[in-house]
Amino acid sequence: MIQSDEDNLDSSETTASTSYSGTSSVSSRLQLRTSLFFENLNGAHGNPDAETEMATVAYETTSRGQGFAVYINNERFSQIMGASTSSSSSSNSSSITQFHDTQDNNIPSNTTVRPTSLRRDNEDTVPLRNVTPSQNAAVRPERAVNSPSSQRLSCALTISTSVLMGEDVEGSPIEQEHSRVVSSLYSSLANRGNDESKNGTPPRPTSIEPNETTEHSFFSYHYDDTLEPDVEEAVRLTKNKTSNVNFISSTGSKGEGETEDEVIDQYEPVNESKFIPHKLKIPEKAGSIKSSTSDDSHSPGAPGTSARKIKIPQSPSLIGNILIPSHNSDSSNESSPKDHIGHNNEEKFSSKSTRKPSTSLEEEGPPIGLPSIPVLRSVSGPSKWTKTPLRLESGNSTKSDPFSRYEGHKTPSPLTKMNKKKNKTLPEHGQPLVLAPIKSQSSESDTGQNSIIEKPARSIRRKQQEKTDNRKEDRHDAENIDLEARMPIQHIDTASIHSFDSGQNGFRDVYSIENIIVILLCCSIVPPLFFIIGCSSRRKLVSDYRLMRLLMNKEHRAALLQGFIWDVDLRWFRMFCLILGAAETVIVMAGIAIGFGVGITRE
């Protein structure tokens, strides 16, 4: 439909189609005032598919009425502008800048106009763009039609019905509608400039970038100078970002008229400088950090990084406050008065609790190759802990502070009785140190049920001493020692292994008589089975493991494991099978011979 109408127009004229909905009376008035030519889409052609041939955006039918196509002559656009400014009372005192600041209440501010240039093919049908307009249908980009007779660029815009009808605007809807149509068209064409007809057709963009939405927005034609970035401010910000860089040296001193930024530019950063190992003075050990930092502070040519000294905490660690140093430590000068008090208490405790015979003098020091572990002080805690502190039970110590012997409950469990019996047999130097459990309010009611868990805390040297004592006793009492009892068990102690009952009277305890009878009946039906079982001890046709599973009871078969040498004598059964097999063969042979003899005699 549009192609047929456009062939009647001049080739030099470019058209812009505008789709909207309205009544026929308003469209006739707009035609007289703005020199617009309206054509009813449904009346132009009888076929209902006329809208599919439009090059503009196809809109769905709304409640406002039927759609119309509006053709605007670009050459007469200036005349329309002049007529509108002279006739409309709202646009008498406004200049061209009025159209830059024009705002329509029916057009949302986020809508943009993209002046796109598309090409109309010579085909009859053009693919549609189905757009569903809202109640306030905003200005939308359309496909500009490139006529076959004209290669000039056409302007295609879609104007909403509310813009042309002016239903939501106060005052005369026709007069205000005219000014809004002209202002919207002018603002959409402002980006293209007024020299389009002079300079000819502008180059058609190959692709539409997303940045065009901001550049060609409907109300963003006034660019402020504040939006442009300040170059000097950007340079200053980039310099501030690199303010944390350590600078080694400057090429020149700061003058009176020079700024601080100019002096910073003369510095050379560490990253770009050549790496010199001896200037950094990296200490080899952690203990030499303090000495190296002190040397760097006094050296005249030290780098700028040495100004920041590594802060080492002078106060002792938290765990050092609760640890008592051992008597071998050399921290008498640096320790606090509390450490001296704890050290004296530890010496008193060690002197009282380490009274041993001359044979155990080696236990005074720590074991060779192992560090000494200091003893913990009493740590402050809840009130229930202070009532029953952790006690350490020693062999000969009767009174010690803060440690004392733990005597246990009044009703000891069987486990404690056994431990007491074992402790009596131990030598005097082998008395174990037992840690008592901490009492609590929740566990006081269950003390009778729970047994006391005693864990001996023996040192490595004590264990070594016990081994040496045992060796000495073994040398003196070698005749009374049962060597067989000390040997580790190298066999599985089950009933099926130690089953010497087969050689004794307990035959029924090992073998199953029912299974033996069933096997013999099967072998009597098939006589070769007797020889297979009897002679398979060497040829391994029937192994001992399979034969035991056939003959033994269920209790013995449950513990049988393949791959072991079982202490079960099965030769009697194999010999019995050979005897029965030979007897059966003799009986069969005799029967056959008797049969032949009877037959011969009858003949």
UniProtKB/Swiss-Prot annotation:
GO terms for biological process: cellular bud site selection; pseudohyphal growth. It is a multi-pass membrane protein. Residues 1-25, 83-150, 190-212, 286-479 are annotated as: Disordered. Keywords: Cell cycle, Cell membrane, Glycoprotein, Membrane, Transmembrane, Transmembrane helix. Residues 537-577 are cytoplasmic. Residues 11-25, 84-95, 325-335 have a biased composition (Low complexity). Residues 336-350, 463-479 have a biased composition (Basic and acidic residues). Glycans are attached at residues 92, 110, 211, 240, 271, 333, 396, 423. The keyword Glycoprotein applies. Interacts with RAX1 RAX2 at the proximal or distal pole in unbudded cells. Belongs to the BUD8/9 family. This is Bud site selection protein 8.
